[in-house]
Amino acid sequence: MIAKMCKEGAMMRSMWLLGLAALSAAAPARAQLLPQLPSLPATGSGVLDRVGQDVETLTGDVARQLEDTRRAAAATLVREHPDRIALDPQGFPARAGEVVVEDPSDALLAAATAKGYRLIERQEVLGIGFARLEAPRGRSLKQAIREIRKLGAAEVTADQLHAQSGSVPGSAAPVAPGTGPLVGVIDGGVSGAALSAGFATGAPRANDHGTAVASLIAGAGTVRGGLPGARIASADVYGSDPAGGNATAIARAIGWMVQNRVSVVTISLTGPANPLLARVIAAAQARGVAIVAAVGNNGPAAPPAYPASYPGVIAVTGVDGRGRALIEAGRATHLDYAAPGADMLAMAGSGRPMRVRGTSFAAPFVAAVIARVYPTPNPAGLGAAIARVDREARDAGSRGPDRSYGRGVLCEACRTPAR
């Protein structure tokens, strides 16, 4: 009997991986960076809904296959957009032919120009300066990074991309208008946001993924949010750019949130560690901004998800309708909370609620809970607010904090069940 159950479990996991591969091939290009489970629309009662095992039961072989799928999807994305996207030295997608230099001196930029590099832009976000340089034709990202480093750059990286959990074509329906706390969403654009700004070509423009995330905060139509009446500050880092969701766009979006005194910002995007983004997030946190981020849906064998893994970021995983950790949930270097991330509805582009699944949709619930007790940025008061949230969390899994649920599950009643 046990052998039969193990065999059936292995077959189910294999079916799940096949479903993931098929969905990755069908999803929009920029949602394939790090392949995710379906968001809008989901697949009804298919194999993805039948898998509900705890992440701790995910076998090593399956986890490795999931990581292989992620890498294959990244390579496919580069093949589809070779002029816009390339792999960085660590194998992560990034803007092709561009490097980012932190705190560049005039002398360094002049030396780079003499070697054929072109200054695209020079900016400062929260007191942190950086420049984007276009490399001479024929230089790989690895070669460009090495060359600029030899000129004396303290920190030079590729402009790495960050992935959404998925989206579908269509014009997005507006979230409910509100007069409550301002909650930030860094994602695709949000229809009906109280504040909106664009940080990519063609932005801001309404996006299904961003609108779905926002609907889980403020509510929209029959979808109840975690904080009804909240106002949404939307920073669109994707627009119409295949290479949207890059680190510099997210950094600028965070700076915009600070300027608008947003106390809680949710980022349902995942990517690799990036030193510029790490510094900007730390600067925002020092100004009292709580950053909430999803751990991603790439399985436990994937590299740690960022920005969830940066120090002080509130890392969020998802649970299904029966309170079980999502089998596909990624990992961060730490985990704070879990929240509903499956067997539920969010607002989609058609103006109707649709099934969603993934840690992207758990993060906004946690952001809503924090914003309820922390409506304005106050560095001295953030710790007390998080302590209040801790008291609301339901302990799950092993007693006390654990790798599957963090310090507990939040906002369980916030889910709009999928019938």
What name fits each language-model region?
Residues 153-155, 179-182, 228-232, 260-265, ...:
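Loop/turn elements at helix/coil->beta-strand transitions in domains of secreted/extracellular proteins
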Residues 181, 185-187, 305-375, 379, ...:
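Extracellular S/T/G-rich loop segment that most often corresponds to the catalytic His/Ser-adjacent loop
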Residues 202-214, 298, 354-366:
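Gly/Ser-rich catalytic serine loop of serine hydrolases
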Residues 173-182, 189-248, 310-311, 330-334, ...:
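Subtilisin-like serine protease catalytic core
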Residues 2, 36, 41-50, 54-55, ...:
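Autoinhibitory propeptides
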Residues 33-36, 238-310, 324-325, 350-363, ...:
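Substrate-binding/access-modulating region of protease and related hydrolase catalytic domains
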